[in-house]
Structure formats: structure tokens, C-alpha cells
């Protein structure tokens, strides 16, 4: 077992534990997968991410910036010596809200995916191609230029102050969600 503890001023704030060597495929994990099957009737794809069962990716979970993310990952994989800067990647057209997965993926394609639901019984993990990194106070989302504030912060003046502050420190090419 691996345990990670977060402390502030010598006070324990958070503890995370994970079984070493166990294939957890936990929510939030990010994988580089390969499309194994396209299922037009489900408007979904099955993706190999290394789990014994293929993972499920629905069209609506591609995310609007899917084509831009694919372009970035393709550049990253083709030249591993130089990591491309996200804000310098040319933005591609957004995916249509009512599109078909076969218009964007084919068998054998590789893509970056994130687990949104852990595998259970006979089913593999559920995936999203809209990658986000969740921290304690923020969610960082590449290729989305928005700053959003949690609805739990209801005072408009505080929401505006936080938006302005976060906008001034946000890295180029990323969106941020402020959490409570």
C-alpha cells in the first residue's frame, strides 16, 4: 500500500491510499488507449486501456475540444523530445453536439482518455476524452479558455473577484473551475 499525506502547518489535511500493483483504474486516472471497436448503434467506442475488459467511450464524452486534444497528443507522440506548448496548438473545430462517433474515431486510433467510472463485475471502465486535472481548489481543463466558479459561491461580488483573480494567474490554453 502507498499512502500520501497532505499537511499544512504540521496539521494533517488529507490522506490518500492506493494498493501497490493493483490494477485499480480509478476515477481520474489518465491513459493512452487504442480504439478496438466502434458501435454505431450505441454511438460509442470500446477502447483498450490495459484493463482485462475494454473500456467504454460514448460520443458525448469526447468533449468539444476533442480534435484539438488529438492534434496536441499526435504532436507530442511524434516528437517526444519537445513537449508542445498547449497555447500554441491551433484550435480545431468543436465536435458537433449531435454527431456520430464514427465521424471522429476509427478502429486502431489512439487517444488520451480519463476514467470517469471504475470497472464493475463484467464491465470495463467508462471513459471521457475531455481530460481534467482536479486539485483541492481548482479543476484544470486544457483547451478550454473559460474561468468558472462553483455555484456554491453565491455572492456575485465574490464570484466576480475570484474570476478576475483566477483569470490573471491562469496558464494560457487552459480553463479553470474554482472549487469551494
Residue ranges and their predicted role:
Residues 1-180:
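Single-stranded RNA-binding surfaces
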Amino acid at each position: 500500500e502507498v499512502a500520501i499525506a497532505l499537511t499544512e502547518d504540521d496539521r494533517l489535511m488529507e490522506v490518500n491510499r492506493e494498493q501497490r500493483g493493483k490494477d485499480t483504474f480509478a476515477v481520474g486516472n489518465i491513459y493512452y488507449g487504442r480504439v478496438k471497436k466502434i458501435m454505431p448503434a450505441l454511438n460509442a467506442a470500446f477502447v483498450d486501456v490495459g484493463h482485462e475488459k475494454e473500456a467504454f467511450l460514448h460520443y458525448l464524452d469526447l468533449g468539444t475540444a476533442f480534435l484539438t486534444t488529438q492534434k496536441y497528443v499526435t504532436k507530442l507522440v511524434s516528437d517526444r523530445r519537445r513537449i508542445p506548448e498547449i497555447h500554441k496548438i491551433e484550435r480545431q473545430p468543436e465536435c458537433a453536439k449531435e454527431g456520430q462517433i464514427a465521424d471522429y474515431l476509427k478502429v486502431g486510433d489512439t487517444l488520451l482518455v480519463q476514467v470517469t467510472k471504475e470497472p464493475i463485475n463484467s464491465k470495463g471502465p467508462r471513459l471521457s476524452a475531455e481530460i481534467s486535472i482536479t486539485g483541492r481548489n481548482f479543476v484544470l481543463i486544457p483547451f478550454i479558455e473559460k474561468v468558472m466558479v462553483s455555484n456554491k459561491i453565491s455572492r456575485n461580488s465574490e464570484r466576480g473577484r475570484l474570476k478576475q483573480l483566477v483569470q490573471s494567474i491562469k496558464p494560457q490554453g487552459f480553463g479553470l473551475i474554482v472549487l469551494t
